[in-house]
């Protein structure tokens, strides 16, 4: 039987992270330069504010959203920041290299930083399914592989289906969810009694998770509209996302009370479901013609998320063998699928309204994009999960899953624990 003492990453982590950072610095030195044009100076402030919103979402929102576990709050916040910082650097280079052929100098603009931040956000969402089951070295590998897979997916879909940046990135809800769930399926499963103890929600960390949900709730309209070019589409995206999020909050609190035998409200259900509307309208937020439709989507999404939070973890554990403590499948994959279906319906409606007879062709294209995104997510997630199972990463023992003591120094604890 293997030892349950924590496996030290003292040599592995610094060597891996610092070598990778040195390589990134060299790549930036030889292959990047800043945009010297003056064309976008008028919109510089507005563009920077959108990028700032995305950074707040990533660093504070997703960082604190996953910090509700009693014994895994430090790692959730700090590891998310680490993945964000690394993912943005790699995404800027990768997007620049993939967007030009033959490869040349990568021009860094505020838009490219926004695009890279959204790519890094995908890793933070996927990591919600595996945080606590992997160490920081494994997360480094996951960041590199997922950002590369997402960038490749965007390039392939753009070249085959001629889609814009927004549509490419909005497929990422499904991509990140299925990528994260597939990686979690490949990892060693936690011990049942240990998992029950470690997954307990503490009061103070749960408040921190709700704080993260509030930051995400405030800035999600910026995320859904970040890559849209047309001012009218950006305005529609912001409005529709706000309406959907507002209804999600009402549905989350009401549904949480309904799901409890005594009518009590669960903080876990609330901070899972308040964002449901933003996810559901993400793909089609710029096409929704009226507020009531966005509000209906927010209502349906909130109910799906509450149902997933109540029944999902047990179902995923029993049927799929996935320790989905963050309800990844219900909060992102099902809601992302709902958003994709609504997008297809709106595209068909727009095609009929304009008198274009190619309805079947439009549906076929949309289904092709959706299927390709899921296929790439499952394939890359499976390869990543198998890669993370290699012993060279010194993964934590299953008895030490979701435990900050494995990674952090606690002055009041004995040496070696």
Curated annotation (Swiss-Prot):
One GO CC term on file: plasma membrane
Subcellular location(s): the record lists: Membrane
Transmembrane among the record's keywords?
yes
User: What SUPFAM superfamilies does the entry give?
Assistant: Ammonium transporter
> Which superkingdom, per the lineage?
Eukaryota
Which terms are listed as keywords in the entry? Membrane, Transmembrane, Transmembrane helix
InterPro entries, sorted: Ammonium/urea_transptr (IPR029020), NH4_transpt_AmtB-like_dom (IPR024041), RhesusRHD (IPR002229)
Protein name per Swiss-Prot or TrEMBL: RH-like protein IIF
Source species: Pan troglodytes (Chimpanzee)
């Amino acid at each position: 039987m293997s030892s349950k003492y924590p496996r030290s990453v003292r040599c592995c982590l610094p060597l891996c992270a610092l070598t990778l950072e040195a390589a990134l610095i060299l790549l930036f030195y030889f292959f990047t330069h800043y945009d010297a044009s003056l064309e976008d100076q008028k919109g510089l402030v507005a563009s920077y504010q959108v990028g700032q919103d995305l950074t707040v979402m990533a660093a504070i929102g997703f960082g604190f959203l996953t910090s509700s576990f009693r014994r895994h709050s430090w790692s959730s916040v700090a590891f998310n920041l680490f993945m964000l910082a690394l993912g943005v650097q790699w995404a800027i280079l990768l997007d620049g290299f993939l967007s030009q052929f033959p490869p040349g100098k990568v021009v860094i603009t505020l838009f490219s930083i926004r695009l890279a931040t959204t790519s890094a956000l995908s890793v933070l969402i996927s990591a919600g399914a595996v945080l606590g089951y992997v160490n920081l070295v494994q997360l480094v590998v996951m960041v590199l592989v997922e950002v590369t897979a997402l960038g490749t997916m965007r390039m392939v879909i753009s070249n085959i289906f001629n889609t814009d940046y927004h549509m490419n990135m909005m497929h990422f809800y499904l991509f990140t969810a299925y990528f994260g769930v597939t990686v979690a399926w490949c990892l060693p499963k936690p011990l049942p009694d240990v998992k029950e103890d470690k997954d307990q929600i503490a009061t103070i960390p749960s408040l921190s998770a709700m704080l993260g949900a509030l930051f995400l709730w405030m800035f999600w309209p910026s995320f859904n509209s970040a890559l849209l070019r047309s001012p009218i589409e950006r305005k529609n995206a912001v409005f529709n996302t706000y309406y959907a999020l507002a209804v999600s909050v009402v549905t989350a609190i009401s549904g949480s009370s309904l799901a409890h035998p005594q009518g009590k409200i669960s903080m876990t259900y609330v901070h899972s479901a308040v964002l449901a509307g933003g996810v559901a309208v993400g793909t089609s937020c710029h096409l929704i013609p009226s507020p009531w439709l966005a509000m209906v989507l927010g209502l349906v999404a909130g109910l799906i998320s509450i149902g997933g939070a109540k029944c999902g973890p047990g179902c995923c554990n029993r049927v799929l063998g996935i320790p989905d403590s963050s309800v990844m499948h219900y909060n992102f994959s099902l809601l992302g699928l709902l958003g994709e279906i609504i997008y297809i319906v709106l595209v068909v409606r727009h095609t009929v309204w304009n008198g274009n007879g190619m309805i079947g062709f439009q549906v076929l294209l949309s289904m092709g994009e959706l299927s390709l995104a899921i296929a790439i997510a499952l394939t890359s997630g499976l390869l990543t999960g198998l890669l993370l199972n290699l012993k060279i990463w010194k993964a934590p023992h299953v008895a030490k899953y979701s435990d900050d003591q494995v990674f952090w120094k606690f002055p009041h604890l004995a040496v070696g624990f």
